[in-house]
Each structure stands twice: as C-alpha cells, then as structure tokens.
Amino acid sequence: MSDINQNLARRPFNRRRKTCPFSGTNVAKIDYKDIKLLQRYISERGKIVPSRITAVSQKKQRELANAIKRARFLGLLPYVVK
C-alpha cells in the first residue's frame, strides 16, 4: 500500500502550455476600438493581466498593452475600477 502512495507522490505533474489566442489563422486582430476583446485582458481592478496567466505571446502582449493604453487615453476604457 505504501509503495503505491510513494509512486503517486513522485510522479511529476506536467501542465500543458496554452497557446497564444492571437497567433494562428482566422483569429481576432488586436484593435484599440474592440472594447469587448480588450476587457478580457483587464482585471477586475482595471489592471492589465500578465501574459503568464492569459498565455499571450510576448509580442502580442505588447500590442495588447499598447491597445489598452490607447483605449484608456481616448476614454474607451477606465484607468481604474472601483
């Protein structure tokens, strides 16, 4: 019985890496006017969610951050949420 528990405890847990939702064919383009898309990448408090959580690639994360900042500047998105 204890051998089974030891084998289960030693078994490594490999989580499959998510793919970038903006890479590939037929995907949504990052646009500062697309508020519904941008709101999925903003936390409840209005902060930009990091790419390690959303699995967005580094290049697309920069585009996303710039689009969010541009939308905030134009008043389409709030800077902070109460």
From Swiss-Prot:
Organism: Bartonella bacilliformis (strain ATCC 35685 / KC583 / Herrer 020/F12,63)
Keywords attached to this entry: Ribonucleoprotein, Ribosomal protein, RNA-binding, rRNA-binding
Entry keyword annotation includes Cytoplasm: no
UniProt superkingdom: Bacteria
A GO CC term assigned to this protein in UniProt: cytosolic small ribosomal subunit
A Pfam short name: Ribosomal_S18
Subunit structure comment from the entry: Part of the 30S ribosomal subunit. Forms a tight heterodimer with protein bS6.
Protein name: Small ribosomal subunit protein bS18
Gene3D superfamilies, A to Z: Ribosomal protein S18 (4.10.640.10)
UniProt record, GO biological process: translation
